[in-house]
Amino acid sequence: MMFDSLLSTITGGGVSHSFSIAMVY
C-alpha cells in the first residue's frame, strides 16, 4: 500500500497502479 502511494507520486498515478500491482503479486 505504501509503495503504491510512492509509485503514484513518482509516475503520476497511471502506470504506477499497474506497476504496484505487479510488484505486490
Swiss-Prot record:
Factors inducing expression: Expressed in the early phase of the viral replicative cycle.
UniProt keyword terms in alphabetical order: Early protein
Name of this protein: Uncharacterized protein pNG1
Organism per entry: African swine fever virus (strain Badajoz 1971 Vero-adapted) (Ba71V)
Gene label: pNG1
